[in-house]
Amino acid sequence: MGVAGGQYLDLSYEKQQVSKIKIIEMAIKKTGKLFSFCCAAPAIIKKMSSQQVKFFENIGSNIGLLFQIADDLIDFKGDSKIAGKKTRKDQKKGKATLISLLGYENAVKYCDKIIFDINKSLKKYGSNSKNIRETLVYILNRNK
């Protein structure tokens, strides 16, 4: 199940008690699959091993998860004028998010953990991973 399946889960989980694992799985399907492909495609084109392709797929899934949580954080606390879209929709609709389950601060801490884990995985690439590391910080700190 990919992006469409993740969106289906998002809609079906509204106003439901959903576990952390299910929320994470939904976010990975909803957003992580897109980032997963974007990260794996260069490895596929370069004809890297299946193990290396899987490594980059996992990095992409985690970046997508981070992006989805960051988007939920913007919805929760963001300014509609700055974000360029209506905010505070998730809570009104009863969306299953890590914020609704863990609270805002714990969702931010979870994002910090995702960033730490991705950076740890990319450590072997040294300065070649600088742009990705900077992008991770941008994703979390963006306001639109």
Q: Where does each model-flagged region fall?
A:
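All-alpha prenyltransferase/terpene-synthase fold signal
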Residues: 1-144
